[in-house]
Amino acid sequence: MKDLLLIITTGNENPEMARFALTGALRQAKSGRYNNVKVLFYGPSEKFIGNSDESTENTLKELVSLNTVDSACIAIAKFYGVEKKLTDMGIELAPFGERLASYIEKEFQVITF
């Protein structure tokens, strides 16, 4: 089995796709198809989840509780002013490039939404 990294960048420009990405991440995390499923948030997705509705928040809480969410980019979270909201949801903030490099080094399969 492979390890899977989902990079979610889609945000308010396509909220339906952003919700699909979150739901897909949750389903993959629960499926047992992979050794490990991790999610990185980057760009507009951070603004989307930082201002999310109750349904989206519930999906995020479940992803966090499954230890699926690795982090969101600290620089982007600051840019959008959502760092407190993200950390309150249990999402760690870290430099995106460093986190991505660590998963590439570990040979995770990468899918971007």
Predicted features, each with a name:
Residues 17-31:
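Histidine-anchored nucleotide/phosphate-binding helix
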Residues 53-83:
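A glycine-rich helix N-cap at a beta->alpha junction
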Residues 25, 36-43, 70-76:
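Short internal beta-strands
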Residues 5-19, 44-52:
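Short, glycine-rich nucleotide/cofactor-binding loops
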Residues 28-29, 33, 39-52:
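N-terminal beta1-alpha1-beta2 submodule of the flavodoxin-like/Rossmannoid cofactor-binding fold
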